[in-house]
């Protein structure tokens, strides 16, 4: 799966008229089956699991997989009749409820488009959403900022652990993937966290085939990553195949940005331009979505999932390497944060 991509080998004779990139995506069935198995394992092994939902593309994929794992899919006629305005995008595609709530840590610095999408998606599904507010942690004094515009991304670990403790969650399902970053590459699918919420890389449990050790002591919990074995290309192929809705900022749009250290920094109320910055209005999209203070877009004309698949086949820089300022503080910045309890 992580071997060098052989485009010719992926082409299928009957696919040439199906899409612009004509990539054979039949391997997605195996990835989907594995992810659904992991989700059902979580539901069966833990008493109080929850699904982390940031409205990012990976969590949207995991949420879609969870619906496939635990809900009944509606037929086409029911989907069309359930849509009030005739748009399939507003109609639910599954009936039933998930066996766990959704969780979002809101830093207060999220992109407005992402929060609007989150609220619309939750309302459409009728699921329970638990929101941990970083500003509540600030009021409690457990989070203290050096200045009002400081990045809150690293501080959300505190709010996450407080939310876990308050609701007594014993497993959080996340959308992390091994191809994103080297610290995530060595993390297990079922990632054990100690009573302090910390990850100990040297104490990871063996995972033999589909056998997982999910035993925990009081106060401990797990993080489970159903799409750990997926790549960015797999995610976009699956989004295209399944017609998964995403926040609009994942697709090309015009936005004011400034150039800093090789990155395009979006101009927002929490990332204003500095005196020597030259503000440009470019056509961009976001490859990954996080805090406004640390997430950068890339120049792109891609308007659809198919366009993004074509782009992804050609990129040479990882999505986090090209877009995240928080990963550039040191070589081990992600591992350090994960040891402290980060996602």
Q: Language-model features: where?
A:
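Nucleotide-activated chemistry modules centered on ATP-dependent adenylation/adenylyltransferase
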Residues: 2-343
């Amino acid at each position: 799966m992580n071997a060098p991509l052989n485009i010719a080998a992926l082409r299928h004779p009957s696919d040439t008229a199906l899409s612009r990139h004509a990539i054979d995506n039949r391997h997605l069935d195996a990835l989907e089956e594995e992810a659904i198995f992991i989700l059902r394992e979580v539901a069966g092994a833990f008493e109080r699991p929850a699904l982390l939902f940031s409205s990012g593309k990976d969590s949207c994929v995991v949420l879609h997989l969870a619906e496939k794992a635990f809900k009944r899919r509606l037929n086409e006629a029911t989907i069309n009749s359930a849509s009030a305005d005739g748009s399939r995008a507003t109609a639910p595609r599954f009936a039933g409820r998930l066996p766990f709530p959704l969780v979002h840590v809101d830093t207060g610095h999220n992109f407005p488009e992402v929060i609007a999408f989150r609220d619309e998606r939750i309302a459409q599904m009728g699921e329970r959403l638990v929101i941990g507010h970083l500003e509540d942690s600030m009021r409690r004094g457990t989070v203290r900022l050096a200045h009002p515009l400081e990045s809150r991304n690293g501080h959300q670990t505190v709010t996450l652990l407080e939310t876990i403790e308050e609701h007594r969650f014993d497993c959080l399902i996340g959308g992390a993937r091994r191809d994103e970053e080297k610290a995530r590459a060595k993390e297990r699918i079922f990632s054990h966290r100690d009573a302090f919420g910390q990850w100990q890389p040297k104490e990871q449990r063996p995972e033999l085939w589909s056998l997982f050790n999910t035993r925990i002591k009081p106060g401990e919990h797990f993080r489970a990553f159903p799409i750990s074995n997926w790549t960015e290309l797999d995610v976009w192929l699956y989004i295209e195949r399944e017609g998964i809705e995403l926040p609009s900022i994942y697709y090309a749009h015009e936005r004011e940005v400034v150039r800093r250290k090789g990155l395009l920094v979006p101009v927002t109320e929490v990332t204003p331009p500095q005196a020597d910055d030259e503000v440009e209005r470019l056509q961009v999209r976001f490859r990954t979505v996080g805090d406004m203070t640390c997430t950068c877009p890339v120049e792109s004309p891609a308007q659809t999932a198919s366009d993004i698949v074509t782009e992804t086949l050609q990129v040479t820089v990882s999505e986090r390497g090209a877009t995240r300022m928080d990963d550039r503080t040191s070589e081990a910045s992600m591992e350090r944060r994960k040891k402290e309890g980060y996602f």
